[in-house]
């Protein structure tokens, strides 16, 4: 592996996966024949299927599932923000009690 890759021990990488430089992978799963571009981070409990292309400067957070044969364009960011800065109609700041984080599935 390249010195420009950071891959945790618990990452599952399929066959014939192509990894560019400056990639961080933590506790995720990458399917066969998938290509990951430069400056990509994929966090724990995220799954990328087979035959996918994840373009450069992409951030995939915990809980995201990308199925087989999916293209993700440049600079796509999936977020899991437990402290959003949204407000209620009366102007009070919303808290984590106002939000429910759901897994994301991309087909």
Could you say what each language-model-derived stretch is?
Residues 1-9, 18-107:
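Flexible, glycine/small-residue-enriched loop-and-beta-strand segment within the central core
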Residues 14-15:
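Short N-terminal binding/cap micro-motifs at the start of the first secondary-structure element
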């Amino acid at each position: 592996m390249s010195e420009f890759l950071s891959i945790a021990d618990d990452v599952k990488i399929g066959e014939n996966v192509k990894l560019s430089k400056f990639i961080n992978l933590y506790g995720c799963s990458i399917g066969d024949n998938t290509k990951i571009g430069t400056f990509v981070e994929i966090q724990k409990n995220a799954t990328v299927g087979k035959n996918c292309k994840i373009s450069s400067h992409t951030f995939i957070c915990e809980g995201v599932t990308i199925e087989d044969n999916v293209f993700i364009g440049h600079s796509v960011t999936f977020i899991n923000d437990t402290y959003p800065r949204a407000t209620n109609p009366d102007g009070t700041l919303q808290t984590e009690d106002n939000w429910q984080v759901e897994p994301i599935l991309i087909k």
